[in-house]
Amino acid sequence: MPQSAEKILDHAPLFREPEYRQMLAEKKLNFECPHPERLVTDQREYSKGWEYREKNLAREALVVNPAKACQPLGAVFAAAGFERTMSFVHGSQGCVAYYRSHLSRHFKEPASAVSSSMTEDAAVFGGLKNMVDGLANTYALYDPKMIAVSTTCMAEVIGDDLHGFIENAKSEGAVPPEFDVPFAHTPAFVGSHVDGYDSMVKGILEHFWKGQARTQAAGTINIIPGFDGFCVGNNRELQRLLTLMGVSYTFIQDASDQFDTPSDGEYRMYDGGTTIKALRAALNAEATLSLQHYNSRKTLEYCREVGQATAAFHYPLGINATDAFLMKVSAISGREIPETIRLERGRLVDAMADSQSWLHGKTYAIYGDPDFVYAMARFVMETGGEPRHCLATNGTAAWQAEMTELLASSPFGKQAKVWPGKDLWALRSLLFTEPVDLLIGNSYGKYLERDTGTPLIRLMFPIFDRHHHHRFPLMGYQGGLRLLTTILDTIFDRLDRETMQTAVTDYSYDLTR
């Protein structure tokens, strides 16, 4: 036997042992009705060509591996950024298990959320009873300061009235009448997680701000970070920069502590987050800035309605984007950008110059959320790199127009193509027919790396197969330095692998790069 009590093997080496190889081969032969190997090989090779690419890109009724998630996931993430807030998803239990596992696998932290556990009867007769019982249990068991309600497909298809259900639950004593239960409709069959995030944040702000008098506090700023798998590192880095500038600010939806709790013997179901007191006071801010435009369109519109100035960015990382963000903050707050931050900027510029010979002319395929793809394309062009494929499954026509304008602004973007609404199976065809040097995305890109040989750089949610990336920033000048290092490490690692064969390629296996 390949293992015993004295020799325990991990699954990776275990399944490579002869006994398991034989078992898997027999299983395939006897139970999987396999096609002849030659036919499989021919089809595989056909799928790499231009003829298949045209068929692949013409798909309309089938989606294969979309680079997005559903609205309620964004709503659950949004709720995690507020003080002692329990996310309550009106729908089936299985859906909520998906949101929790997705967040837990990325952040390596518990992700708390509950559901109304709707089943077949609720799908027919409505989920009012589930809502009443669920809110009562949530309030009694988990001691939240706020319960944020969102929805799944089931509740939206039958048209459950969240506002009416919540009021009924309060009248029946499930929660006290004054208890805060904001809500948002987040149907999973349209939009994506960024829309769910936007709707939930808007719903929470509307809950606390509607009907309240506003007294503007000059120079104060609200920051909405957006759905960000790197929120732990990014939020803390931006807070550090704003503190160095002496800015009076409030982070609206800050999940950095919730998804980075310490191991000190105390379990924290809730940790950190924007306090309800700060949330109420945020109405009086002079301006609200969003770090991700496509994550906050509804929210910023509401902020303008209450009288605030607004501005939106596209995931401010790199030189130009960080410059624009800090200058906007400086203009609103009246605070100068201190010398400490100017030095950080200079160090990033110096690092980019030091490594220019390795970065210039590198080609990239970038996929992910619209703001992230925009930001990464802008950053690689700053380094002399060339984006060739920019893909966002949840990208809109407006995003495509913005991307086209960005890419046209630099000679490094002239050969780029923008792909809104396409999925990762389409990207596979693009990588085979128009190969690039590097692929930037999330863990789902590892199958593209396996098939096409394009090195994957994991820089976006979700990252399941690597640990702790989210603890370090991508935004700001310090984040840009880490991003630069990550790209360079991937380039050098590949070069080392390609030049390590003794007496064949090792004349370029250099100690100094």
Swiss-Prot record:
GO biological process, one term: nitrogen fixation
Assigned GO CC terms: molybdenum-iron nitrogenase complex
Co-factor binding comment: Binds 1 [8Fe-7S] cluster per heterodimer.
Class in the EC hierarchy, top level: oxidoreductase
Enzyme Commission identifier(s): 1.18.6.1
Sorted UniProt keywords: ATP-binding, Iron, Iron-sulfur, Metal-binding, Nitrogen fixation, Nucleotide-binding, Oxidoreductase, Plasmid
Pfam families: DUF3364, Oxidored_nitro
Keyword ATP-binding: yes
Needed cofactors: [8Fe-7S] cluster
Keyword Iron-sulfur: yes
GO MF, any single term: metal ion binding
Catalysed transformations (reactions): N2 + 8 reduced [2Fe-2S]-[ferredoxin] + 16 ATP + 16 H2O = H2 + 8 oxidized [2Fe-2S]-[ferredoxin] + 2 NH4(+) + 16 ADP + 16 phosphate + 6 H(+)
Chain positions recorded as [8Fe-7S] cluster binding sites: 70, 95, 153
Other remarks on this protein: Ala-188 is present instead of the usual Ser that would serve as a ligand for the 8Fe-7S cluster in the oxidized state.
Self-association state and partner proteins as the record states: Tetramer of two alpha and two beta chains. Forms complex with the iron protein (nitrogenase component 2).
Job of this protein: This molybdenum-iron protein is part of the nitrogenase complex that catalyzes the key enzymatic reactions in nitrogen fixation.
Homology family: Belongs to the NifD/NifK/NifE/NifN family.
Protein name, UniProt field: Nitrogenase molybdenum-iron protein beta chain
